[in-house]
């Protein structure tokens, strides 16, 4: 399967799911239902598109991390079911958390994501590499550095906001609050437990589509076009 067909198949899966679920989300909105489960499910579509492309384009002898793929598809199916059921059989809000189906969906992300990651880590190196999922030491280090940079920029932005409003004391009081140091580890743990949501977009857009667009429109043009898409 050539590159053009792969891109078309990727778009077909990704935007096909988006279109169908978008119609259902619109129906739910006009019915006054909570539609928070739909955007969360939508974040999984791009990676699903890549997996379908890899399965369709692979050679007979080529091995892929099928256990990981199957688990991912199961997670996708369950999250889509939760989204659809949220407009058919609304469960109501869980105090302080969100709509019932959204809460169930969150558990699907966590349990399914952890299971998928374990199955991926157990795969042989060459099988993971065939799907672009073999994370090397320097890649993990780079990822941590980027996360630290994001945190630093967020704090700087927050500081500038307080400075412009003349509330520098209030900014300092944020770091004097013990609850901050309790919540930070929780947020980090939650980030890794729910990684599958972010993986869905990064694997689809960054890993698969961005290199194709950069090849055709240049490094900057490809990134800009990806942002538009």
Predicted regions and their residues:
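Membrane-helix interface segments
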Residues: 3-7, 139-140, 218-224
